[in-house]
Amino acid sequence: QFRAFWETQQPEASKTRVIIPVFNCRDIFDRIIGAIDERQEDYVWTLDSAPSLENYTVSVYSPKFKDAINPDADNLTSWFRDWQIILRRNVPCSVVTMQYGNVETAYGTVNIKPIDSPFSYLADILADGNLLIEKWQSNDFWSRVVNCTSHYAAKTASFDKVVLDALNVNEFDFVSVAARWGTLNDFQKNLVWLWYRVYPTDEYYSYACKKASCVSEIPEKIRDEILLISNRSDRWIEERMAAVRALSFHSFDDSYFALMDKLPLDETKLKLLTYQTHEEKTYAVKVISNMLRDGAEPSAIATTLLERDYPSLASYMKDEMGCDDVIDEYMAWYRKNKIINRYPGDYPVQMTFDRFDARYKLMHKLQGQDCVSFWIDGFGSEYTPLFLHELKVRGIVPESVKLATALLPTETEYNHQWDEHDSMAIKWDRLDSFSHKGMPDDKSYYSCIVHQLSVFSDAAKKVEELLENHEYVVVTGDHGSSRFAALAFHQENVIPISAPKKSTVRSFGRFCELDDNTGDIIALPHTVLATSNGKRYLVMDNYQHFSVSGNAAGGNTDEHDVVGEIHGGNTAEERLVSVIVIKRKQPLPPVTCKPKGGLFVTKKNGHVEKNLQFSRPISTLEVSYDNKEATCTMNADGAWLVILDGVTTDDITLSVIANGRLLPNVTLKVKTQGISKNDDPFGGVGL
């Protein structure tokens, strides 16, 4: 275009004058135009001066950058007008013009850089822009980075400043960034992906992030890359664990555990689990089962590998109850072999339980106290050390912990004392449900163990809540359950025992109910005779069972763990329960009661209703008057509606028992509906 313009002839009479300053470009002019004839010589001027000691850099941008940068000149006219002022600042300068396509790169006293792409701009303006590689990200991404640099002067900021500002942090710490991963946008995540490419380190985070081909792979690479290398330093393991915990994986799939299975050492597998998910905890129980089969000791595993990361399993494996040495020794053996998940053989020690009180005898001592009974179905003494651990975590120390015996047979229907003797009782069924059948869509026994352990953290929390409104909480179970009795059900070398004629076999053969017409019976070997509600039973005293069909833990093998525990028999894990009494550290203020809305009530046909309010929430209420029981119902707001019938007097004195404690009497004033009683018929005139 310039050459065509230069060579165009103009009329001699034309008064048009075009002056085109071309800076530092005589060599380019000579190359494009070549020789000039004598008619043109008078129209080319070269303004020259002594070489400058200064070097100048002028970046020429396309209009697409007009909103992303603050140029020194926002068009060519401004540049022609102010270039001397701009260059005098002695800093790199910038021009935005639509003529950027006609600009050529030049080097020398004045360096000219035409810039059309966002990446080229970044490489130009960032102090360490040379470390960036354009193919790492898309043009749209680099454009967003350009927007982040609009307030920086050229060469005064580096890429790390851009990243830190975008992440709103003062220094880059991968664990802190990972903890916010779910709240970061795609742009911020891609900056993290770029960080270790621009600034690689010897940290595990750097190694794993550089393995990610895109930002979406970062969590997976952080989690998995350490499983694929042969040498894992303790530092890398610690860094990986901190990052994985921060990323908070909600679940792990089978492919992840397949990678874990390839690791040669079981100890390493346990070290690489976060124990934040149910799947990981289940996998840990599986790994520990293999370790115990190979001769490892439960206490050693618990102390060195579990106490910090999975304290509930550590407690289950190593803690003792401390009430009875024989029982502690047996339960330690039982818990170890339960995790091994193999039938251990014959019942190791024939035990008698005469030295232990019945459960109700121990609980009866709290009768008359402000005490709530918390029953956990299936809470055998197997779990007592774990529950004590969970209470301790919450700063709760029981007043007493004692072993007691459940009633034979050890089934709930023979042990439901909570609805026989205690109006202030709650009951949980989840532990027993887990023990019998696991979860509806999960029949792994190792998974079942994890569910069982989780009950006691929740139970300790429940105790804490109950103590807010009660002086005492007593925790117990109706019975325990036996894994080995379930495994024995399918053992070829365990021969079922034939039940007496006309008896009914119950609970997978753990006991049988004798016919009412059966005469005196001598207990069979390994059985005990029991009586309940006029019925007689033969109860198994070991892991054997009466002959009956069923599928308790059917299909369980070393490679395939199948859920299932049963009860009804007389083994220690089925028969022994704990009675744990917990008292508030500080006494509660006495419960007080007052009628809601005042003392007056309306009577209609002898029927009276009144709401009573209490100074704190109560669980049970008994109200009587003139030896008549009132009907009491708790309202949604915590007040209680008391309904009285057969009222004949004008004053009603109520006897109130709240939470098992007798409160001061409450007197109500009765008025009959539709009749107003006036004790002064003369209106106060004094006659």
Enumerate the predicted regions with their spans:
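…; additionally, a secondary subgroup of soluble metalloenzymes is captured
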Residues: Q1-C371, G378-V473, G477-L687
